[in-house]
């Protein structure tokens, strides 16, 4: 399911985003936004700062949150009769096991993530801050401090 939207970022303008959601399904009154992953995915977070912290391995959680926002912006008709949107990861290696879909959970209290207006506002603020940093010519691009990310990166040779 292709989803797309533009985000108005102060001092930058409209920034287009798009993505392909691997699967949408309904469980009770929750619409699950599911992304298939071939590797491990950390689906725990402390707070929104944790999601945007580049020293943390939160790219999969960030991606699924982005899909929730894109879905809400681009396909609101899919959200009718839905109380919640929830990001999930489905590790491909676990597909033989029953119900191995991993829900994003909050580390405090181990509660499931709920996409609501407060979380959405925090997410948009974090995303806007990240984009302002990326577009700021005074901020140099730096290689990641997480060396494992370089293993499959097509640009790894440029950083060394």
Q: Over which residues does each language-model region extend?
A:
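RecB-family 4Fe-4S metal-dependent nuclease core
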Residues: 1-160
């Amino acid at each position: 399911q292709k989803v797309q939207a533009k985000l108005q970022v102060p001092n930058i303008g409209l920034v287009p985003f798009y993505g392909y959601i691997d699967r949408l399904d309904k469980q009770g009154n929750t619409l699950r936004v599911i992304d298939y992953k071939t590797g491990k995915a950390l689906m725990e977070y402390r707070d929104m700062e944790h999601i945007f912290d580049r020293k943390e391995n939160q790219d999969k959680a960030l991606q699924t949150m982005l899909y929730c926002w894109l879905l809400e912006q681009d396909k609101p008709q899919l959200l009718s009769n839905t109380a919640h949107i929830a990001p999930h990861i489905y590790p491909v290696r676990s597909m033989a096991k029953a119900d191995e879909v991993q829900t994003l959970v909050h580390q405090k209290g181990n509660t499931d993530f709920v996409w609501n207006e407060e979380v959405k506002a925090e997410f948009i603020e974090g995303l806007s801050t990240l984009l302002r940093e990326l577009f700021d010519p005074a901020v140099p691009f730096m290689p990641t401090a997480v060396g494992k990310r370089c293993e499959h990166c097509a640009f790894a040779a440029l950083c060394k």
